[in-house]
């Protein structure tokens, strides 16, 4: 009997924080455990879009706070130390409005998020705000000028102070004082862990590596996460933290087929077995999603939504083919469809060229980073055979920033890469109008 179900109960396109929803990645979880329990070091989580970096970072944060449920789920509980290092954690998702290191540090020092913000580490008990004022737009000074704290029976001490016109030193004061300050009030933890997600979007990251190196100690640890095929793409001056990052470099690659299948067995459990996916359907989604959990989650969610619309909880081949028809016609995924329309414009020829590039077979093996690269020359003869005559006039829109871009130029002439590999997988599905 059909029962309406919330698609979000089993599938989500958001960052996964709940360990029960997290699937696979046992090797990466083990790497995270090793990095967290190292006395010193920097953690760097990097990889392509859509592979689940932010979700992994949130699992790392859970373990840093002392919750090792994800390790138990991954069968790694025997590797958890008798006394694992515990952290006060700060999490901040960067955005493209942050131009440089100084602006990032200013954001961190003014973040009042109750769960993840740096300022929440100022103890509430006995907290005194000595001065608060708005800085001039041209000043590098921060809004928070001085915070004092103290508990009855203890000396009132200066917790953290902002040095006018010196954002970096102000940040140093905050992070180096936070562990001692909070250990006076709560059960003791070993260090503070500052996690910077989407670190790659910061325009100029020069100097961040040396700042991280100078602050890293047994009581202060940093973790950065973002898009990049190597550490150099994520941290420009990564050589300054080379020794510290050795154990904490965590490269997130596309999922194996078995891990992608586990997304659907996990979803069925979360749906309390009210929803079922035929094995052949799951196999097809595994192939279509190409190891990107974000895309697999989107397709799963769309399937359950369509099941609700027609009154069924059983996603078989017939139902899934109807779901695919909606995806191929651009009705299911508004964000990916918007990317597609922006890239091709009103040109049928450009749409055909984009599909040819997306479908180009790579020489590298599957689940290898080289897979994303396409060679324009390999597509020319096929494109011309389909009547696409002016390829060089069609390409600029595909690489221009204002239209996406759909493609980014490689180091060698005529070599390109899809900026978003999930978008590439979508283009392969999308039928030409």
Language-model segments: which ranges?
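A short, basic N-terminal segment
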Residues: 1-46, 62-76, 80-85, 433
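The catalytic "switch" region of P-loop NTPases
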Residues: 4, 8-10, 184, 188-193, ...
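Glycine/serine-rich loop-strand microenvironments at binding/catalytic pocket rims
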Residues: 23-51, 212, 216-218, 345-353, ...
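Short, conserved phosphate/pyrophosphate- and ester-handling motifs at nucleotide-, phospho-/glycolipid
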Residues: 25, 54, 292, 420
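P-loop NTPase nucleotide-binding core
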Residues: 40-194, 200-203, 220, 381, ...
